[in-house]
Design a protein with these regions (language model features):
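Active-site region of PLP-dependent enzymes
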Residues: 160-172, 180-275
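Short beta-strand->loop structural element characteristic of the AMP-binding/adenylate-forming
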Residues: 79, 95-105
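Conserved coil-to-alpha-helix start sites within the AMP-binding
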Residues: 80-86
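Hydrophobic residues in well-ordered beta-strands that form the structural core
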Residues: 77, 98, 154-156
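Active-site phosphate-binding strand-loop segment of PLP-dependent enzymes
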Residues: 104-196, 201-203, 207-208
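N-terminal "arm"/small-domain region of PLP-dependent enzymes with the aminotransferase-like
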Residues: 1-28, 32
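Phosphate-binding glycine-rich loop
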Residues: 27-74, 88-92, 98-100
Length: 275
């Protein structure tokens, strides 16, 4: 019996050519392609502050480190989601609570988040996470109101949602714009809308958060005038995306609308055949 994969990347000649060109260049990492890719993500999402990472999981971890999440901090996540966010928050010692999801969308709802707060008697909520399953963003105004009411951070796990839109007060906004949330996480794993092999990104509402995460992403290093002269000003890690992956991402994102249309057509076929 033939193995049927639940997802597969779409790679064409332009992606291969972009990778080869980068392999022949002077930079395989920390080069210009990473910055160019981040600019493309910013343009696609309408967010000024985009920071690439070597995976979506690293993007969540980097955000958690930037926020200094610690033992006893209260976090709410949807009970349908990839295990990465639960693993990271648990590893850091946070109290992780699971909000129920709507049986129509498979997503946590504002009511289920508030119900979780009341049921678990959470006095101080540090952060809640939403995940638009299949790229369908819902209840944005209500989630925004929760963020304001409880004075907490709102992280959007938008790994399914690159290229999606949502409506806020009758105005169309882009997924990942961070106009109403604090952080938006993207993944560029092969099954996502575009791929960089492995890769991810964080979009930020606040420039200060962006600058701190940028330091944490690369060993806490601050470069001086001469490239060999630098200081290490905080404990950081290596969560950087490489230039070859970024070059493929730049090529892929040019076909984002085509990729989304293909997925929409497949979804329509499922709805038709599974009536």
């Amino acid at each position: 019996m033939a193995k049927i994969f639940y997802g597969k990347q779409s790679i064409d000649k332009s992606d291969i050519d972009a990778a080869i060109k980068c392999l022949k260049s002077n930079f395989l990492t920390t080069g210009p392609k990473v910055l160019e890719f981040e600019k493309e993500i910013s343009k696609t999402t309408g967010c000024k502050y985009s920071l690439s990472c070597n995976s979506g999981t690293s993007a969540i971890f980097l955000t958690a480190l930037m926020l200094k999440l610690k033992k006893g901090d209260n976090i709410i996540i949807p009970n349908i989601n990839f295990v990465a966010s639960f693993n990271i928050f648990s590893f850091l010692g946070c109290n992780v609570y699971l909000a129920d999801v709507d049986n129509r969308t498979g997503q946590a709802t504002p009511d289920s988040i508030i119900e979780c707060i009341k049921k678990e008697k959470i006095k101080k909520l540090k952060c809640f996470v939403t995940m638009p399953l299949g790229g369908l963003l819902t209840n944005i105004e209500e989630f925004y109101n929760i963020r304001k009411k409880y004075k907490c951070f709102w992280m959007e796990d938008n790994c399914h949602a690159l290229g999606s839109d949502y409506i806020f007060k009758k105005k169309i906004e882009k997924a990942g714009s961070c106009k109403h949330s604090d952080f938006s996480i993207f993944s560029f794993h092969p099954i996502k809308a575009i791929t960089t092999f492995e890769g991810g990104c964080i979009n930020f509402r606040d420039k200060k958060h962006f600058e701190k995460a940028k330091l944490l992403r690369s060993h806490g290093i601050v470069r001086k005038k001469n490239y060999w002269d630098y200081d290490v000003i905080l404990n950081g890690f290596n969560f950087r995306l490489n230039d070859v992956s970024a070059a493929v991402g730049i090529s892929q994102i040019k076909r984002l609308k085509k990729f989304i249309a293909k997925r929409q057509n497949i979804a329509k076929l499922y709805f038709k055949l599974l009536k």
